[in-house]
Amino acid sequence: MVNKFLVLLSALLISGCAEKLPVPQLRENYMVYEVDMAELSGLCLNKDKTALLACGDTGTVKSISFTGEAEDLWASGADMEGITLNPSNGDIYLAIEGTQEIHRLPATTYNQQVLMFDVNDASAFKNSGIEAVEYYKKNIVFVGSQKGANLWQYKINGTLVSSISLSDFASEIAALCYDEASDCLWVADSKLAKIFVCTVDGQLIDSYDFPFIENAEALCVDRDRKCLWIGSDEAATKLYKVDFDSI
């Protein structure tokens, strides 16, 4: 079922990161889809950018069309909190909260889940641990945690590259999306009902309020469709498509 809404979002024009394309400006329009997926907690685009890939707390990975239809890809029972794709080979990476691990689903069949590395700094966080994984570049991923709003960079072989906290402006990291065009990170904070835009080294650029989204735990910037996809982990899982303008 598709519901269409118009809302007034207070969107400010914000400058781009580094010397890349500017950060998009959010518009008034959004749509919401009810999705057949329990506890949606991670989103990214597939390799061809023809659909979304999604993961859920119950350990499922699905392909979701841009109109909300879901198709099963993989299930393991692990507490999946974040999903991202390596664009060079199509491998899927998953953030597993209970064990604080990053797992891999090798392309193209996605029928085997293997351990990549442990996030040792989050080993004591339990159910307040890692919530997001996001491919950056040169075989480096970002990993974000709920507790402490920690942001780590890891090589995919498990080597820690850097560690910072976004706690100056965020109460948690519920989801991450790296926008290559602007060289910026988008960060969802479900507790504050906000989405932040910051540089890759954690300098805040701006923020957007999303009071109409109950529990934003998944986030994907889609420049081809000029929108932001936001997954909300509610009683009935919802996928929001929020329009933006490329500046």
In which residue ranges do the predicted regions lie?
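Sec-dependent N-terminal signal peptides
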Residues: 5-14
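Sequence/structural signature of beta-propeller domains
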Residues: 17-247
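N-terminal secretory signal peptides that target proteins for export/translocation
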Residues: 1-2
